């Protein structure tokens, strides 16, 4: 069990230019140093003082947590699922998630952070909470809405979210990590995304009405 991370103090909007500089610095430095990145390095890269970072974000953990949540924002879903847009929304989500995983910075960061797991177990575990864990929670909440609206059969939404993410990613991220041939074009990723979503929707189709 890992301690939940506090959110950054209020007043740090994602579109603030100063925050954007910090965000860019964090993403670049985590790709270079993994979880060993320090607030001194972040401050130097972002062009601010370490004291400013602590005043705005509270701690390195809270800062990484906020950047992690913002990194997942690209894989958005509509606020509420509907019958007419369910498939299209999930396909768009899958395509965005696969595109994010295909970014060189994402792949490099994953390799580096995994290699640091023995040396920094708590920090690496919190990276999971901030990124993959938060994504599962958000997707589960959305799927639960779809289940309540009768668009999907009722089941454990967290299990459904984990299964769906596994279907979307398949083995392709492992192929990339091991330098094996993979789906390296948007067209190939889109084709797989549609296949994964259609398979998921068949598996979780609501029961036919009884007359």
PLM regions and their residue ranges:
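Key DNA-contact positions within bacterial/archaeal DNA-binding proteins
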Residues: 51
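Helical hydrophobic small-molecule/effector-binding pocket
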Residues: 91-123, 169-172, 208-209
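Basic, helix-initiating cap at the start of DNA-binding domains
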Residues: 1-45, 55, 61-62
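Amphipathic alpha-helical linker/stalk segments
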Residues: 65-94, 99-101, 105, 109
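Amphipathic alpha-helical packing segments from all-alpha helical-bundle domains
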Residues: 84, 107-108, 112, 122-148, ...
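C-terminal peripheral helix-coil segments that are non-catalytic and often amphipathic
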Residues: 1-7, 92, 96-98, 144-149, ...
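Short amphipathic alpha-helical segment with a characteristic S/N-K-E followed by hydrophobic residues
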Residues: 59-65, 74, 123, 127
């Amino acid at each position: 069990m890992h301690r939940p991370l506090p959110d950054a103090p209020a007043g740090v909007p994602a579109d603030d230019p100063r925050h954007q500089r910090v965000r860019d610095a964090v993403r670049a430095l985590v790709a270079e140093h993994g979880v060993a990145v320090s607030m001194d390095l972040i401050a130097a890269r972002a062009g601010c003082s370490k004291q400013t970072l602590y005043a705005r974000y509270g701690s390195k953990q809270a800062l990484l947590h906020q950047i992690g949540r913002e990194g997942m924002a690209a894989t958005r879903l509509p606020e509420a699922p509907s019958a007419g847009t369910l498939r299209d929304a999930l396909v768009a989500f899958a395509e965005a998630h696969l595109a994010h995983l295909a970014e060189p910075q994402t792949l490099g960061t994953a390799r580096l952070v995994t290699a640091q797991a023995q040396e920094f177990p708590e920090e690496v575990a919190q990276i999971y909470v901030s990124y993959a864990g938060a994504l599962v929670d958000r997707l589960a909440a959305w799927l639960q809405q779809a289940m309540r609206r009768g668009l999907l059969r009722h089941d454990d939404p967290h299990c459904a979210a984990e299964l769906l993410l596994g279907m979307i990613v398949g083995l392709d991220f492992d192929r990339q990590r091991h330098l094996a041939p993979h789906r390296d074009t948007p067209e190939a990723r889109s084709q797989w995304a549609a296949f994964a979503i259609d398979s998921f929707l068949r598996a979780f189709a609501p029961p036919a009405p009884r007359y």
